[in-house]
């Protein structure tokens, strides 16, 4: 990378190994979010697992999806609730949901 990207200062040192975030090109953000949300809704829409916390999360997610959330988009909302989702998926022993969440974390956050 000879020239810095527009708006970013040039590095004054060489990286020994590239950071994993060289580019977001080719990452399926929407697909990753959609898979994690499908797992999440399976639990939080079930009265046995839903509660006021998850009801508030769903309302905030609807606002983000509608573009009504000025300070929070869907990805940020998911990012800020990772630990709660991990707890829920671990409680349910849902290894597939945990794997999809890990992919979302590693590729998109």
Curated annotation (Swiss-Prot):
UniProt-listed GO biological process terms: nitrogen fixation
Keywords: Nitrogen fixation
Alphabetized HAMAP family for the sequence: CowN
Reported function: Is required to sustain N(2)-dependent growth in the presence of low levels of carbon monoxide (CO). Probably acts by protecting the N(2) fixation ability of the nitrogenase complex, which is inactivated in the presence of CO.
Family in the record: Belongs to the CowN family.
NCBIfam families: N2Fix_CO_CowN
Protein name as annotated: N(2)-fixation sustaining protein CowN
Organism: Xanthobacter autotrophicus (strain ATCC BAA-1158 / Py2)
Gene name of this polypeptide: cowN
């Amino acid at each position: 990378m000879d020239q810095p990207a527009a708006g970013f200062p040039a590095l004054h040192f060489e990286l020994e190994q590239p950071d994993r975030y060289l580019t977001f090109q080719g990452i399926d953000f929407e697909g990753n979010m959609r898979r994690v949300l499908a797992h999440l809704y399976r639990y939080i829409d079930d009265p046995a697992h839903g509660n006021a916390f998850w009801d508030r999360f769903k309302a905030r997610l609807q606002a983000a999806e509608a573009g009504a959330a000025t300070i929070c988009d869907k990805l940020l909302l998911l990012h800020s609730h990772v630990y709660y989702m991990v707890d829920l998926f671990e409680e349910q022993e849902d290894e597939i949901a945990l794997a999809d969440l890990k992919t979302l974390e590693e590729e998109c956050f």
